[in-house]
UniProtKB/Swiss-Prot annotation:
Component of a red light-dependent nuclear complex made of PHL, PHYB and CO. Interacts directly with PHYB and CO; CO binding requires the presence of PHYB. It comes from Arabidopsis thaliana. This is Protein PHYTOCHROME-DEPENDENT LATE-FLOWERING. The lineage of its organism: Eukaryota, Viridiplantae, Streptophyta, Embryophyta, Tracheophyta. One of its GO terms (molecular function) is transcription coregulator activity. Keywords: Cytoplasm, Flowering, Nucleus, Receptor.
Length: 1325
C-alpha cells in the first residue's frame, strides 16, 4: 500500500476561511457537532436551515475532499466527490447501499472520533491533504421526498495507531536497521502524540475525561436500532377453514422512524369487528420480552368464533399510542400462546377505532355460520415442534359444558407446559373492564376497549439469547391489582349494558342439564398441578362486577351466565415455569355446580401446595357469585390490593411425598455426582520406622547443641560473637592391627590444626602439627597469623577437604579461649602483668566491679585483679567501662559496704631443707640475673617520673624479668630444676591428701575464684596487699572471687608470681646484696632505701592484719572493720588502736618522699634500724630453712620484712599467745584452708610494739572516715568457717576479740592450714 502526502506550495501562513453555503428552505437544522451547538447562517430562520459550517475550523473550502460519506435511512454509501455531487437530491439514492451492520459501526465510530478507519482503508478512495484525509458527510436521514439538500459536514481524519500497526509490516523490510526502525518510530510518535507527558504526577483530570472526543455526531444509536428493526419479523400464518378461505398474514411494512419505543413489541391495529373485545385477557398479557425463537410460525385450526372468544387464541401484542406512553400488553390464551388472532363475524361496534392514526387493514373476517364443526387444535411449542394434538368435537354453542370443560383444560394444560413466561391475566371478563387497568411500565390506556377495531399483530423486538430467558425468567408482569375506580369512566358507563355480551354465551346456556358431571383427566391434572405456583388462585364463576351480589366495587368476578373462566394476575418472579392458574368451570344450576367447583378448587389447592411455604403470601380478593352459582374465589391481584379474605391452605400430602423422595435420594445418594477432583486417595501411607528409630537413638540428651559446621567467625559463646575463641581440628588415621585373632584399630598418624584468636588485634594465630593447645596459647605471638577469622575459616575448610581426601578422620571443636591464668600447669601461672601494659599503676587498672547493681560476682572477679585477665587483654582493660579514678576507688567500694578483699598468703607447706636450699639459691641467681638484665635493658622499663602513683615501678620490671624474657612475652621457660621441684611439690601434696589450691584451677573449683591459690598471688595485682591505699576484702559470694584486691603497686605483686620466686624475701635479699656490692647506682640505692623505710613503717599495718582479713571469702563476707583487723593482731591490748591503723593507710606514697604519717623522730628511728633489718634478713635466710613454696608465693615483701626484723621476739610472743588462747583450739578444728586463706600464727604475731606504736599517729577523724561501714563489734561467738559449715550467715558477722579462734577458722575453703610445730593452737599438719 502506498501512502501519498501532499505538501502545500504556498509559502504564506494558512488561514482557514469560513465557507457559506446556500440555505435550502426544506432542509432541517444542522447537526450539532462535538457536543457544542454550531451556529447556522444568518439566512436560516426558524426551521429553515442550510448546510452546516465545517466541523473543524481549519478546513477551508479550498481543501480538496478525499471522499464523501452519504447516510440514508436504509444504509450508507461511500463515493468520490464527482459521484456524490451528482446525487444532490433525496431521489437520487444509489441503488446499492451498505447496511448498518457491525462493520458500519466501526467505520462510523472512527469517523466520529476523527480517526482514519483502519479496517476499510483500502476500500476508501483516499486522497491525503497535509497528512490528513478530508471526509465530507452527507446526511439524508431526516429528509423526506420533498426535501432536497442534505446536511453536509466536513471532517478531517488523522492516522491512528491502528493504521500504523497495519501499515508498518507492509512498509518495512529486512533491509531496515535498528536505527531506521527507531527513527520511524520516533517520527510516528511525534506525529500521533505531539504532546507526550512524562510527568509522574497523576493527572486525574485526564483520567476522568474521555481521551477520544467526538468530532461529529452521526447518531449511531439510532442507526443501531434501525439495524435491529430491519431484522426479519415474525410471520404468523393461520389456516382458517371458515368458508373455505385461507388467510395468510405476512410481514408488515412500517415506517423506520418511530422514535424510541419503550416496549419491544409493536401492535398494529386494523379495523375489525367487536368480537375482538371478547377475547378476555389477550389484551393484558405481560409478555414484553419474548424472543423471536419463541414466536414461530404456527398453524392452528381454530374453533368457531363463539368459542374463540373464550379460548382467547391470540399472539403477543403491544399497543402504542402517539400521544401517550406505550403500554406493553401480551396475551396468552389457553388454546395457544402463538396462535394467530382470527377475525370474528360479530358486527358489534364495527366502526370504532383507537384515538390514533390507524394503519391499513387487510380485510374483514366473515361471520362463521357453522358452529358444529370438528376442529383440530395444533399447538406449537417454543421450538416450533407441535407438542400436543387434541381433538375435541365441538357440538356448538349449545353443547354440553363437559366438552367445554375438557377443551379448556386441555388448552390450559398445553399452555402450562409450553409457555415459558407468566401471563398477567386471563380474565373471565371482557377487556371492557381491564383495558384501563394500570400497567407496571405504562400508564392507563387512553382509549376504551369498546372502540377497538380489527387488529393485526406482529412481533417487533430485538433478538435475545434464549438461554438467558430460560435460565431465569424475568417476569416484568403488569399488575392487575387496581380497583374499579382506575377504570376509564367510559368503560364503567358501558359495563351494565355489556354484561351479557361479556359472558359471550347465549341465554340458552343457562338451560344446560345440571346432572352432567365434569369429566376429569387425572393424568393431565397431575401434570398441570406441578406447574402451578403457590400464588395461583382458585377461580370459579361469579356474579358480574357491579351486580348486587358483588362484595365490593373493586373486586373482579365473572358473569352469571354459565361456564366461565377467568385470568389471574400473577406477579411472581421465579426461575421455574410459571403457568396460568387452574380454571374452574361450574354448571349453571343447583348444587352440582357448587360441588364441581369445590372439587376443582380442591384439586387446585393440592397442586399448589408445593410452593406454599417457599413463596411469599399474596393478598387475595374473595367475591361472591350470582344467585344461581354462588362460589368463592380467591384472586391474588398484587400487594397493593386489600386482603379481603384469608388464603386457603392446601393439603400437605404432596409435600410429604416430596420430603420422602428427598430423604430417599439423600440416603442412597441418587442425585450425588462426585467429581474426580473431590476423590482424593485414601490409601494408608506406610512410614519406615527404622530411620526414625535410628534418629531417636542418635539424639543427644544435652540441652546445649553445637552445630558441627560452626565456623570460628560465626560461633557464639556466652551470648556474644565477640568472645575470643579457639578452633582445634584433630586429624587421625586408623591402622588395623591384628592382636591375635582379634583385629583392632589404633591411631597411626595424628596431627591437629589449632587456630587461636588474638585479643590484641583480632588476628588468628594458627599452627599445624602434633602440638598441644596450651603450647600454642603460650607461643601464639611467635606463630603465623591470619588477618581475621573469616580467612581462618577458609583455611580450615580447605585443609579439612585435603585431609579428608587423604583418608584422615576429622574431629573438631570450637571453644572459648582460656584465660592466661588457666593455660599453664599447676603453679606455673604467667605474670599477671602480661595482661596489663607494663608500667601501669594498679590504681589505673582499678576495676569498679561492684558499683553496678546486679553484677555477678563471677563477672566482677573476671574483671578484677585476680589473674583472670584474658591473654593480651590490654584493649579489654583500657576499654573497660567500669574503671574509676585511683583517688576515690576505695571510697566508692567502701560505699557499697563490701570490699573485694586482699589476696593473702596461705599456710606454708613444709618442704625438705635440701629443696628449700636449692630453690633459694636458684632464686637468688635469677634475681641477680634480672637485675643485670634490667640494667642492660633500661628501655624496657618505664621511668618512675611518669607514674607518680607507683613508687615501685623500677621493681616492677625487675620482678617480671625474673620469670620472663625481656620482651615481656607470656611464654615461661622452665628449667629442669623448676620442673623437678614442681613435680616433687605435687607429689608431696598428694601423699599428704591435701587439696592444694596452687592455681586458679583448684581455687575456682572450690568456688573461691582466682587469686586464692599460691600461684594466683602473682595474678592478683595487689598480691602483696601492702604499699597501697586500696584494701579490698571478703569476696562477693561463693561463686565469685573472694580475692579481687587492688593496690597502687602492681610490680610488687608480681614479685611473688614467678614459680621460682618461692621466697619473696630473696628478692629483697638480692637487692640488699647488690646494695652492699655496689652493683646499683646511687639513684637506685636511694630509691630502695625509701622503699624499705616505707615497708618498715607499714609492715605491721599492711602485712599481717590485711593478709589475715583477705582470707574470708564465699558466703562469709567480712566488712572492713577495726575488729576484723585487730583481732588478728598479736597485741590484744591495742585492739582498737591497731584496727584504726590497720584498716587504712596512706593513700599513696610519692617516690622520694617519706611516710607522711610519721613524725621526724620515727623517721630517724627507721633510718637507724635499716642496717639492723638487713642483718636480720640475711641471718634468717641462712639460719632458717626455706619456708613452704605456697607461703613464699603468697607472702608480700612487707610481711617478709617484718618477719626478718622481729623474728626472735615474736616467736616468744607467739608461744605465749598460743598457750593463752584456749578458745582457739575449740573454734579451730582441723580445717582445709583456701590457698589464699590460710595464715600462721607466726605471721600474725610478727608485729612488735614499736610497729603498733607506729600505727597510732592517726586522728580520730580519719578513723571515723574509714570505719562507718564496719560491722558491729560485740561479744559473741564467731562462726567457724570450714568446709563443714557452708551455710549462709550474716553478711556482716559480729566479731569479738573474746571469741576469736585461730586464723584458719576465718576461711571456708577446703585447704588444710599448717602452722609451725610450736603452735599449740595450730591445725594438724
Amino acid at each position: 500500500m502506498g501512502v501519498s502526502f501532499k505538501i502545500s506550495k504556498v509559502g504564506r501562513k494558512f488561514r482557514p476561511k469560513i465557507s457559506t453555503e446556500l440555505a435550502t428552505p426544506d432542509s432541517p437544522k444542522a447537526i450539532v457537532l462535538s457536543g457544542k451547538p454550531k451556529a447556522t447562517d444568518d439566512s436560516n430562520i426558524g426551521d429553515v436551515s442550510g448546510f452546516s459550517k465545517p466541523s473543524l475550523p481549519d478546513i477551508s473550502p479550498d481543501h480538496e475532499v478525499s471522499f464523501i460519506l452519504s447516510l440514508y435511512p436504509n444504509g450508507y454509501s461511500i463515493g468520490k466527490t464527482s459521484e456524490a455531487m451528482q446525487q444532490i437530491s433525496f431521489r437520487d439514492v444509489p441503488k446499492v447501499l451498505h447496511p448498518y451492520d457491525r462493520a458500519a459501526e466501526g467505520l462510523l465510530s472512527a469517523i466520529e472520533a476523527g480517526r482514519l478507519p483502519g479496517d476499510i482503508l483500502e476500500d476508501i478512495p483516499c486522497k491525503f491533504v497535509d497528512g490528513v484525509v478530508i471526509c465530507e458527510v452527507h446526511d439524508y436521514r431526516k429528509h423526506t421526498s420533498s426535501q432536497v439538500s442534505p446536511v453536509i459536514n466536513k471532517l478531517r481524519l488523522k492516522m491512528s495507531l491502528e493504521n500504523v500497526v497495519k501499515d508498518i509490516p507492509s512498509m518495512s523490510d529486512n533491509s531496515w536497521t535498528y536505527g531506521d526502525l527507531m527513527e520511524v518510530e520516533s517520527r510516528i510518535l511525534k506525529a500521533l502524540q505531539p504532546e507526550l507527558c512524562l510527568d509522574p504526577l497523576p493527572r486525574l483530570d485526564r483520567l476522568s475525561k474521555n481521551p477520544l472526543t467526538a468530532k461529529l455526531d452521526l447518531s449511531l444509536s439510532t442507526l443501531r436500532r434501525k439495524r435491529l428493526r430491519q431484522m426479519a419479523e415474525v410471520t404468523v400464518m393461520s389456516q382458517n377453514k371458515i368458508q373455505g378461505k385461507k388467510v395468510c398474514i405476512d410481514r408488515l411494512p412500517e415506517s423506520s422512524e418511530r422514535g424510541n419505543l419503550p416496549g419491544h413489541l409493536i401492535m398494529q391495529q386494523t379495523n375489525n369487528n367487536q368480537a375482538i373485545q371478547n377475547l378476555g385477557t389477550n389484551m393484558l398479557a405481560g409478555l414484553r420480552s419474548q424472543p423471536l425463537q419463541d414466536a414461530p410460525n404456527s398453524s392452528l385450526a381454530l374453533v368457531p368464533p363463539q368459542q374463540q372468544r373464550y379460548m382467547g387464541i391470540g399472539s403477543t401484542r403491544n399497543t402504542q399510542d402517539q400521544g401517550s406512553n406505550s403500554v406493553s400488553v401480551s396475551g396468552a390464551s389457553p388454546g395457544g400462546l402463538d396462535a394467530m388472532l382470527p377475525y370474528g363475524s360479530d358486527s358489534m361496534n364495527p366502526g370504532t377505532s383507537f384515538h390514533r392514526k390507524r394503519e391499513s387493514q387487510e380485510g374483514q373476517m366473515s361471520s362463521m355460520p357453522g358452529l358444529n364443526k370438528r376442529t383440530r387444535v395444533s399447538h406449537m411449542g417454543p421450538d416450533g415442534v407441535p407438542q400436543q394434538q387434541l381433538g375435541q368435537r365441538m357440538d356448538g354453542l349449545h353443547g354440553s359444558d363437559t366438552n367445554w370443560k375438557n377443551t379448556l383444560l386441555q388448552h390450559q394444560d398445553m399452555l402450562g407446559r409450553s409457555i415459558q413466561y407468566p401471563n398477567t391475566s386471563i380474565q373471565r371478563f371482557s377487556p371492557h373492564q381491564m383495558e384501563g387497568v394500570m400497567n407496571q411500565e405504562g400508564g392507563p390506556m387512553q382509549f376504551p376497549a369498546s372502540q377497538q377495531g380489527g387488529m393485526k399483530y406482529t412481533s417487533k423486538e430485538e433478538p435475545f439469547e434464549t438461554g438467558k430467558i430460560d435460565g431465569g425468567t424475568r417476569n416484568n408482569i403488569p399488575g392487575v391489582g387496581s380497583d374499579a375506580n382506575d377504570l376509564d369512566p367510559r368503560i364503567q358507563s358501558r359495563m351494565p349494558h355489556n354484561a351479557f355480551i361479556r359472558s359471550n354465551f347465549p341465554q340458552t346456556s343457562w338451560n344446560v342439564n345440571p346432572g352432567q358431571q365434569i369429566e376429569k383427566e387425572p393424568k393431565k391434572e397431575e401434570q398441570f398441578s406441578r406447574r402451578i405456583s403457590a400464588q395461583s388462585p382458585r377461580l370459579s364463576a361469579g356474579g358480574p362486577p357491579q351486580s348486587p351480589l358483588s362484595s365490593k366495587s373493586g373486586e373482579f368476578s365473572g358473569g352469571s351466565m354459565g361456564t366461565h373462566y377467568g385470568a389471574v394476575a400473577a406477579a411472581q418472579k421465579d426461575k421455574a415455569v410459571t403457568s396460568i392458574p387452574a380454571i374452574g368451570a361450574t354448571q349453571s344450576v343447583g348444587s352440582s355446580a357448587n360441588e364441581a367447583m369445590q372439587q376443582r378448587q380442591h384439586q387446585a389447592q393440592m397442586a399448589a401446595k408445593r410452593r406454599t411455604n417457599s413463596l411469599p403470601k399474596t393478598q387475595v380478593i374473595s367475591t361472591v357469585g350470582s344467585p344461581v352459582s354462588v362460589n368463592t374465589i380467591s384472586v391474588p391481584v398484587n400487594a397493593r390490593s386489600p386482603s379481603v379474605g384469608p388464603q386457603t391452605l392446601g393439603d400437605h400430602a404432596i409435600l410429604d411425598r416430596f420430603s420422602k423422595i428427598e430423604r430417599v435420594a439423600a440416603r442412597y445418594q441418587l442425585n450425588c455426582k462426585k467429581h474426580k477432583v473431590d476423590e482424593y486417595s485414601r490409601r494408608p501411607r506406610v512410614y519406615a520406622k527404622q530411620p526414625l528409630t535410628v534418629c531417636l537413638s542418635n539424639l543427644s540428651n544435652e540441652e546445649v547443641f553445637k552445630d558441627e559446621d560452626e565456623a570460628l567467625s560465626k560461633s557464639i559463646f556466652g551470648g556474644s560473637m565477640n568472645t575470643y575463641k579457639t578452633r582445634v581440628i584433630h586429624f587421625g588415621q586408623m591402622e588395623r592391627v591384628m592382636q591375635g585373632s582379634v583385629p583392632s584399630f589404633i591411631p597411626r598418624n595424628r596431627t591437629r590444626l589449632v587456630m587461636s584468636e588474638k585479643a590484641v588485634d583480632g588476628t588468628v594465630a594458627w599452627y599445624q602439627g602434633d602440638v598441644d593447645e596450651g603450647d600454642v596459647f603460650q607461643a601464639e605471638d611467635f606463630l603465623l597469623a591470619l588477618p581475621n577469622t573469616h580467612i581462618a575459616d577458609l583455611l580450615a575448610t580447605q585443609f579439612k577437604s585435603l585431609m579428608a581426601r587423604e583418608g584422615y578422620m576429622i574431629e573438631e571443636h570450637i571453644m572459648a579461649k582460656p584465660n592466661r591464668g588457666d593455660t599453664g600447669p599447676i603453679s606455673s601461672h604467667p605474670n599477671s602483668a602480661g595482661g596489663y601494659p607494663r608500667g601501669y599503676s594498679a590504681n589505673d587498672m582499678q576495676q569498679y566491679g561492684d558499683a553496678v547493681a546486679g553484677q555477678a560476682s563471677g563477672e566482677a572477679s573476671k574483671h578484677g585483679n585476680t589473674g583472670n585477665t584474658p591473654n593480651n587483654s590490654t584493649q579489654n582493660i583500657l576499654a573497660n567501662a567500669r574503671m574509676v579514678p585511683p583517688t576515690n576507688s576505695q571510697a566508692l567500694q567502701m560505699s557499697q559496704g563490701l570490699l573485694s578483699g586482699v589476696s593473702m598468703p596461705m599456710q606454708p607447706q613444709q618442704l625438705d631443707p635440701q629443696q628449700s636450699a636449692l630453690l633459694s639459691s636458684h632464686s637468688q641467681q635469677k634475681n641477680q640475673q634480672s637485675m643485670f638484665t634490667q640494667q642492660q635493658h633500661p628501655q624496657m622499663q618505664r621511668p618512675s617520673m611518669i607514674l607518680p602513683t607507683n613508687p615501685l615501678s623500677a621493681i616492677n620490671s625487675m620482678s617480671q624479668s625474673s620469670g620472663m624474657q625481656p620482651g615481656g612475652q607470656m611464654a615461661n621457660k622452665y628449667s629442669p630444676l623448676q620442673l623437678q621441684m614442681l613435680q616433687q611439690q605435687q607429689q608431696a601434696a598428694v601423699q599428704k591428701k591435701i587439696m592444694m589450691g596452687l592455681g586458679s584451677g583448684v581455687g575456682m573449683g572450690m568456688g573461691m575464684g582466682m587469686g586464692m591459690g599460691m600461684g594466683s598471688m602473682g595474678n592478683s595485682i595487689a598480691g602483696l596487699g601492702a604499699l597501697g591505699n586500696q584494701l579490698n576484702m571478703a569476696g562477693r559470694g561463693m561463686g565469685g572471687t573472694g580475692i579481687s584486691s587492688s593496690m597502687s603497686v602492681p610490680g610488687i605483686g608480681n614479685m611473688g608470681q614467678n614459680p621460682m620466686n618461692l621466697n619473696p624475701a630473696s628478692n629483697l635479699n638480692a637487692i640488699s646484696q647488690q646494695l652492699r656490692s655496689g652493683a646499683l647506682t646511687p639513684q637506685q640505692n636511694a630509691l630502695f632505701t625509701q622503699i624499705r623505710m616505707g615497708m618498715a613503717n607499714r609492715g605491721g599495718v599492711m602485712g599481717a592484719p590485711q593478709t589475715g582479713i583477705s582470707g574470708v571469702s564465699g558466703t562469709r563476707q567480712m566488712h572492713p572493720s577495726s575488729a576484723g583487723l585487730s583481732m588478728l593482731d598479736q597485741n590484744r591490748a591495742n585492739l582498737q588502736r591497731a584496727a584504726a591503723m590497720g584498716n587504712m593507710g596512706p593513700p599513696k606514697l610519692m617516690p622520694g618522699m617519706m611516710n607522711l604519717y610519721m613524725n621526724q623522730q620515727q623517721q630517724q628511728q627507721q633510718l637507724q634500724q635499716q642496717p639492723q633489718q638487713q642483718q636480720l634478713q640475711h641471718q634468717q635466710q641462712l639460719q632458717q630453712p626455706m619456708s613452704q613454696p605456697s607461703q613464699q608465693l603468697a607472702q608480700s615483701p612487707q610481711q617478709q620484712q617484718q618477719l626478718q626484723q622481729h623474728e626472735q621476739p615474736q616467736q616468744a610472743q607467739q608461744q605465749q599467745q598460743a598457750t593463752a588462747s584456749p578458745l582457739q583450739s575449740v573454734l579451730s578444728p582441723p580445717q582445709v584452708g583456701s590457698p589464699s586463706a590460710g595464715i600462721t600464727q607466726q605471721q600474725l604475731q610478727q608485729s612488735s610494739p614499736q610497729q603498733m606504736s607506729q600505727r597510732t599517729p592517726m586522728s580520730p577523724q580519719q578513723v571515723n572516715q574509714r570505719t562507718p561501714m564496719s560491722p558491729q563489734i560485740s561479744s559473741g561467738a564467731m562462726h567457724p568457717m570450714s568446709t563443714s559449715n557452708l551455710e549462709g550467715c550474716p553478711a556482716s558477722p559480729q566479731l569479738s576479740s573474746q571469741t576469736m579462734g585461730s586464723v584458719g577458722s576465718i576461711t571456708n575453703s577446703p585447704m588444710e592450714l599448717q602452722g609451725p610445730k610450736n603452735n599449740s593452737a595450730g591445725n594438724n599438719s
